[in-house]
Amino acid sequence: MNKLSVVILAAGKGTRMYSDLPKVLHKIAGKPMVKHVIDTAKKLSAAQIHLIYGHGADLLKQHLADEPVNWVFQSEQLGTGHAMQQAVPFFQDDENIVMLYGDVPLISKETLECLISQKPENGIALLTVNLDNPTGYGRVIRENGTVTAIVEQKDANPEQLKITEVNTGVMVSDGASFRKWLARLDNNNAQGEYYMTDVIGLANQDGFKVVAVQAKDLMEVEGVNNRLQLANLERHYQRKQVEKLLLAGVTFADPARFDLRGELTHGKDVEIDINVIIEGTVRLGNNVFIGAGCVLKNCTIADNVEIKPYSVIEDAIVGNNAKIGPFSRLRPGAELSENTHVGNFVEIKKAQIGKGSKVNHLTYIGDAEVGHHCNIGAGVITCNYDGANKFKTLIGDNVFVGSDSQLVAPLTIASGATIGAGTTVTKDVQENELVITRVPQRHISNWQRPKRK
């Protein structure tokens, strides 16, 4: 098998997006379009990924800083052929070169593998598609079934405009052939540009075969020029993801109201209500229920967990049989053991909650360790920040913390301790102690309320 490299054209401005952001950085499923294409190139085990860039160079490099791409600058956007010419110095003669586009994000590894497998020796394999309305696309010209040329819309005659088979722009040939044909391109056309499609005619002139492979899924080769097209591809992508999950046994209250912006793995009997968003890498165990409006990002959820509506979980771990929400927030570093309860308007950050413990109402637990079978009352705050540094709160097992208490870190509360409601704790608490700092209650008889003047 020949070595393979990929060229991704990503230099365009995207005027019709009406945005300062380069077009290829607009997102599908929470990921820049060009990143989808790069990920597909990686799946092909490409030896090199050449990224042709121009407009928005700094933003592109910022967003793709961790990607293994060869940055190839195109100072002027003079057509697809001109873009490919910039990458020619990096081609090896005996490698296959696949040409892709940063604004065609849903092209699949399987489709490209099929295309590559059909490439004739020293020839070209071209990805095409039949459209009911081919307006705007380059028409595929055939003679006796053989592809002889591609004519762009603005250069086509009336008979050619009737053709419904169109060029997707995706093609593969070897490095030596591309180098030879790209050197012979001219811009003698209505646009004054160097068309990559002209290499089809050059290949025929040289007696080399051009094979057309039809894409099975039209949406794989749909490009994005405006936000309507972007939204259509987003919905198509989400439908495909939901179909896979449904067939794998996940129940959705409404498949049209779910967004997957990453990777979801799951056990059996998972149920997901409406308007749930999954981001990053999320792992769900068996018998997990996710209520309406929840957002889960980079988290692991064990078996028999109930996540009630409008809870947000990010970079957290949740143990078996936990109950979360509604309106709970688990921030990075939150770890809930089995049989824990975290209730409404509770925020937990960088803290471990022991098995059987409950934090049910209006509470902030940050930079803390809470032992087993504790009860943290409503309105409790771990005061972990002094304006410059963070400090930790350690709570043992079987601790009861009364409502509206403040735990000023650094602080240790030993097992079995009880903190009375309304207490501000500033010193360590020993085992089985009761701590209370409440102001003494006063009773004033025959109190007269103030009267309005």
From Swiss-Prot:
Residues 1-227 are annotated as: Pyrophosphorylase. Binds 1 Mg(2+) ion per subunit. It is an enzyme of class 2 (transferase). Residues 228-248 are annotated as: Linker. It is found in: Cytoplasm. GO terms for cellular component: cytoplasm; membrane. UDP-N-acetyl-alpha-D-glucosamine binds at residues 9-12, 23, 74, 79-80, 101-103, 138, 152, 167, 225, 331, 349, 364, 375. Pathway: Nucleotide-sugar biosynthesis; UDP-N-acetyl-alpha-D-glucosamine biosynthesis; N-acetyl-alpha-D-glucosamine 1-phosphate from alpha-D-glucosamine 6-phosphate (route II): step 2/2; Nucleotide-sugar biosynthesis; UDP-N-acetyl-alpha-D-glucosamine biosynthesis; UDP-N-acetyl-alpha-D-glucosamine from N-acetyl-alpha-D-glucosamine 1-phosphate: step 1/1; Bacterial outer membrane biogenesis; LPS lipid A biosynthesis. The keyword Magnesium applies. Catalyzes the last two sequential reactions in the de novo biosynthetic pathway for UDP-N-acetylglucosamine (UDP-GlcNAc). The C-terminal domain catalyzes the transfer of acetyl group from acetyl coenzyme A to glucosamine-1-phosphate (GlcN-1-P) to produce N-acetylglucosamine-1-phosphate (GlcNAc-1-P), which is converted into UDP-GlcNAc by the transfer of uridine 5-monophosphate (from uridine 5-triphosphate), a reaction catalyzed by the N-terminal domain. In the N-terminal section; belongs to the N-acetylglucosamine-1-phosphate uridyltransferase family. In the C-terminal section; belongs to the transferase hexapeptide repeat family. This is Bifunctional protein GlmU. It comes from Histophilus somni (strain 2336) (Haemophilus somnus). The lineage of its organism: Bacteria, Pseudomonadati, Pseudomonadota, Gammaproteobacteria, Pasteurellales.
